[in-house]
């Protein structure tokens, strides 16, 4: 899809923000076909103009962005990019919108005239392009507030069937949060996994994401702060703005470190960094799972995991909102299994079964 081929609707109750966002997109050649000041008029604009992508504010009078996102998914399915305030309640509302089917989110531009505004514009435009290319049909399950345990196809197994001290690294980006949540919710505690989650997400949101995963999973999930040692039954989420490195391994416990090294694949945290350091350090069963997302992050890392004797599972195209990261991983030739979203847990568990 060329820049000129992308049509956008901008929904925000602030005229100032509508102007800022519209100007950013217009400058990049993305056509803003309509703007709206509340959710109801936003839904109508989407119905009328049939855009490729919607940028959606959350807090608006009348119909808010969460309800509007749900209505759009029900009535005229269109990729939605949530523009979220950087605050605790903003993070929670953002995840509620993603439950309704929003593909991704972006921290709302401050609107301040500063040297950082150009970088904000570049990041917003990249997000809009990514979301515009998303397959909304692949994310429709998210709009039903996934009750994954009720619909899980995960095969029942006994604890004695699993290998000892397995480690799982999950990497995802666009469209990933609800898929990660479903995957973790379907992994039994009996598997005794040590889990690292690298989701492309800014600081201020990864902590809330970890809390959601903790509530959805049998595993104890927290945001990495650096220096932790985790064992079986525990999971860490990479903190936004930091790479998550595996810096040591002993007695079945992982030690992790956060670094502010340069972005890799234009992102930080990068899946490749975690996978490559895990491949170097983990002396035990290691599995990588590459989920929906734009770009090639994780492709180099899965080669390292495979070379170290580990296993690789990737999400299939049909259920990926953006089949970028899984496709690039598959193209390396080292992926052992490709599974749809509701079979990813089974795919992971198959890699840690005793022979």
From Swiss-Prot:
CheB-type methylesterase domain residues: 161-355
Q: PTM details? A: Phosphorylated by CheA. Phosphorylation of the N-terminal regulatory domain activates the methylesterase activity.
Active-site residues per Swiss-Prot or TrEMBL entry: 173, 200, 297
Q: Which GO terms describe its cellular component?
A: cytoplasm
Q: Which InterPro entries match?
A: CheB-like, CheB_C, CheY-like_superfamily, Sig_transdc_resp-reg_Me-estase, Sig_transdc_resp-reg_receiver
| Example GO biological process | chemotaxis
Which residue numbers delimit the Response regulatory domain? 7-123
Q: Which residues carry this modification: 4-aspartylphosphate?
A: 57
Annotated region described as Disordered, given as residue ranges: 139-159
Q: What is its EC number?
A: 3.1.1.61, 3.5.1.44
Location within or outside the cell = Cytoplasm
Keyword tags: Chemotaxis, Cytoplasm, Hydrolase, Phosphoprotein
Q: What class of enzyme is it?
A: hydrolase
The UniProt similarity line reads:
Belongs to the CheB family.
| Annotated domain remarks | Contains a C-terminal catalytic domain, and an N-terminal region which modulates catalytic activity.
Purpose of the protein: Involved in chemotaxis. Part of a chemotaxis signal transduction system that modulates chemotaxis in response to various stimuli. Catalyzes the demethylation of specific methylglutamate residues introduced into the chemoreceptors (methyl-accepting chemotaxis proteins or MCP) by CheR. Also mediates the irreversible deamidation of specific glutamine residues to glutamic acid.
This one is known as Protein-glutamate methylesterase/protein-glutamine glutaminase
Q: Can you name the source organism? A: Natronomonas pharaonis (strain ATCC 35678 / DSM 2160 / CIP 103997 / JCM 8858 / NBRC 14720 / NCIMB 2260 / Gabara) (Halobacterium pharaonis)
User: What gene makes this protein?
Assistant: cheB
């Amino acid at each position: 899809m060329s820049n000129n081929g992308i049509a956008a609707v901008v929904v925000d109750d602030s005229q100032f923000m509508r102007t800022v966002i519209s100007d950013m997109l217009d400058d990049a050649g993305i056509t803003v076909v309509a703007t709206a000041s509340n959710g109801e008029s936003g839904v109508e604009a989407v119905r009328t103009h049939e855009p490729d992508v919607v940028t959606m504010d959350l807090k608006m009078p009348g119909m808010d962005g969460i309800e509007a996102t749900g209505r759009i998914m029900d009535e005229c399915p269109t990729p939605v990019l949530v523009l979220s305030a950087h605050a605790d309640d903003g993070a929670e509302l953002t995840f509620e919108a993603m439950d309704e089917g929003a593909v991704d989110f972006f921290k709302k531009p401050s609107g301040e005239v500063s040297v950082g505004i150009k970088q904000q514009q570049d990041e917003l435009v990249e997000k809009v392009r990514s979301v515009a290319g998303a397959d909304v049909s692949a994310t429709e399950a998210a709009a039903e507030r996934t009750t994954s345990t009720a619909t899980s196809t995960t095969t029942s197994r006994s604890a004695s069937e699993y290998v000892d001290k397995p480690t799982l690294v999950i990497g995802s980006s666009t469209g990933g949060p609800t898929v990660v949540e479903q995957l973790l919710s379907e992994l039994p505690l009996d598997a005794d996994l040590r889990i690292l989650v690298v989701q492309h997400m800014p600081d201020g949101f990864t902590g809330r994401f970890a809390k959601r995963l903790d509530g959805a999973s049998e595993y104890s999930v927290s945001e990495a702060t650096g220096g932790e040692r985790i064992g079986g039954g525990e999971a860490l989420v990479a903190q936004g703005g930091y790479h998550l490195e595996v810096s040591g391994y002993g007695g079945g416990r992982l030690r992790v470190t956060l670094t502010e090294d340069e972005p890799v694949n234009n992102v930080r945290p990068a899946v490749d960094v975690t996978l490559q350091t895990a491949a170097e350090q983990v002396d035990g069963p290691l599995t990588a799972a590459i989920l929906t997302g734009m770009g090639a992050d994780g492709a180099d890392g899965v080669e390292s995991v495979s070379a170290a004797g580990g296993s690789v599972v990737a999400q299939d195209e049909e259920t990926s909102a953006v089949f970028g990261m899984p496709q690039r991983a598959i193209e390396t030739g080292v992926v052992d299994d490709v599974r749809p979203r509701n079979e990813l847990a089974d795919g992971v568990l198959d890699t840690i079964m005793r022979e």
